Amino acid sequence: KGHRVVTATGTLCTEQVEPVFNVHADVRRTALVGIGAKGAQTPVLCVELEAGVAKTEQARIADELRHIGEGHVHTGRIDRFLFHPGFPVDIRHNAKIGRETLAVWAARHAQDLP
């Protein structure tokens, strides 16, 4: 069962949300996390960029991701993006993102959100 973000207006499932944003050419991968108490979480999409993409491109990429999300019913409410230098992963399964660790990081960096 995938991870879920439970907001005041509904539940978002990572396996339905992340593929929508992962199509962006500058994005290596994304991870949906929730900030706050379950049932009232704020959805935040953590973004890991492809190698060589400059930090100065983050504002443009966030705008483009926002536009991509608006084209889908289940991603239209996601408008907060945080850029992470390299997602934490489970040491036993290198591809498995450490979402709990990432959610704590996102909560600490929430003030960086536009």
Report residues per predicted region.
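AMP-binding/adenylate-forming catalytic core of the ANL superfamily
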Residues: 1-74
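Conserved C-terminal "lid"/linker of ANL adenylate-forming enzymes
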Residues: 31-36, 45, 66-114
